[in-house]
Amino acid sequence: KILRLDISDAASISSSSGSADALEALGVQIDLTPEQGEKLIEEIGIGFLYAPNFHPVMLKVLGPEDQLGIKTIFFTIIGPLINPADAKCHLLGVYQPELVPMAADILVELDFTHAMVVHGLDGLDEISILGKTSVAEVKQGKVNKYEIEPEDFDLKRCSIEDVAGGDPQYNADTIRNLYAGKDEGPHRDFLILN
């Protein structure tokens, strides 16, 4: 079975640049056609699908969202749900706690096999290493709501400064260190959780 991995390009609260920026700094070619992205997933089991290349309307939303400095429901929720890889397992981070149950209900309606909608109660739109995270887990058409915290996974809490990203080159260097086993601190723990 092929692992289908799609990382959307949204700068999170913990970083000033998105995943596409860091991947480009690592030398990854992100400006692929849908056919090239599909071929990568089929051949090696992983691929980065840059949303604007697959859904051109996202280019129209991405610019104003960046200029206004706001997150919209379109890019942060609808964008990941129209995943061109048609992945039925998903980890979806949302930027407001009230979006957790709403997004989970949408995932049920879209017949996702297994998904988690998460919101760090400290404001992160991902599973938080800083404190508690609200989770709505979708499995077999049912939604189970609960909270998790780093200690549930034998991980230590940290501060936002400990996991803050930076410019694309800083983030690329952090990724290299993580995958080389040179970083066993909060960045690693954050990666493990998400």
Q: Language-model segments: what does each one mean?
A:
Residues 8-9, 32-34:
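Short beta->alpha connector loops at strand-helix junctions that form conserved
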Residues 18, 36, 102:
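Short Gly/charged-rich anion-binding patches and loops
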Residues 2, 24-31, 39-194:
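Glycine-rich anion-binding loops and their surrounding alpha/beta cores
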Residues 1-9, 13:
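Active-site cofactor/substrate anionic-group-binding motifs, chiefly glycine-
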Residues 12-29:
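Active-site-proximal loop->helix
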